[in-house]
Design a protein with these regions (language model features):
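Beta-alpha-beta core module
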Residues: 13-14, 58-107
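Secondary-structure junction motif
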Residues: 10, 24-44, 108-116
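Short beta-strand-to-loop elements that line the ligand-binding cleft
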Residues: 28, 47-56
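Flexible hinge/capping segments at coil-to-helix
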Residues: 4-26
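Residues embedded in well-ordered beta-strands
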Residues: 1-3, 9, 27, 70, ...
Length: 124
């Protein structure tokens, strides 16, 4: 999902045009060597020129809320977003794979079952 500050010129439109990511300061979420966002930019032949790079989702939400730029964040982290930001779907597919391995449903803890329920309720 693209996250924008409230009042952003594209906040009231439908899907966010992926090429418009180049028109605004971009805040990059960088976790580990394999970045899904870097891959997304490469897949759509977009040059990635972040104005800020951070490891923390909440830092990005705070920076976006403050008007420092826009970003792409996983839908899962945005479900309980405490910040005043706008969430928009992109006009092209952007996703990541989440794998969850277990021996049997009977062996799962309550927390693991709830996590599995949460994964099942996401729009895929």
């Amino acid at each position: 999902m693209v996250v924008l500050p409230e009042g952003h010129p594209l906040a009231g439109q439908g899907q966010f045009p992926h090429k418009a990511l180049l028109d605004y300061p971009f805040i990059l979420l960088e976790k580990g060597e394999q970045s899904e966002i870097r891959t997304f930019f490469q897949d759509y032949d977009l040059p990635l020129r972040p104005c800020f790079v951070t490891l923390d989702d909440y830092a990005i939400m705070s920076m976006v809320e403050s008007g420092l730029g826009i970003s792409i964040l996983p839908q899962l982290i945005l479900q309980r977003c405490p910040y005043r930001i706008v969430q928009k779907e992109l006009d092209v597919p952007a996703y990541r794979e989440i794998c969850f391995a277990f021996r049997s449903l009977d062996s799962l803890s309550l927390a693991a079952r709830r996590f599995l329920d949460c994964l099942g309720s996401l729009r895929l």
